[in-house]
Amino acid sequence: MRKERADAVVVQGSLASKNTAELALKRRLPAATVPRSFAEVGGLMSYGADGPDSFRRAAGFVVKILQGGKPADMPVEQPTKFELVINLKTARALGLDVPLHLQQRADEVIE
């Protein structure tokens, strides 16, 4: 990451969130991604569609299909609930100050 002189990284969701968070911190790179678990395991922040809400909505489509509904007749839906999680412990380790207004907008702030 540092080889390319990046100032920060946005990481595509990954099963290796903990490793990615640790590497970013080691390289002193602020990093953000979608799943909230990234911030929970040490990433700077995560922002994206609320996973459980999206899964519940998908399950509703499965029920309709199993009851005989035609997928082609079902509307395409976009996420409506998003979640911002900020890890202040990581921010401090990186020497970053997260503005108070951003902390106040967050769904969760990890101290």
Task: For each feature predicted by the language model, list its residue ranges.
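Short hydrophobic alpha-helices and adjacent helix-cap/hinge residues
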Residues: 1-111
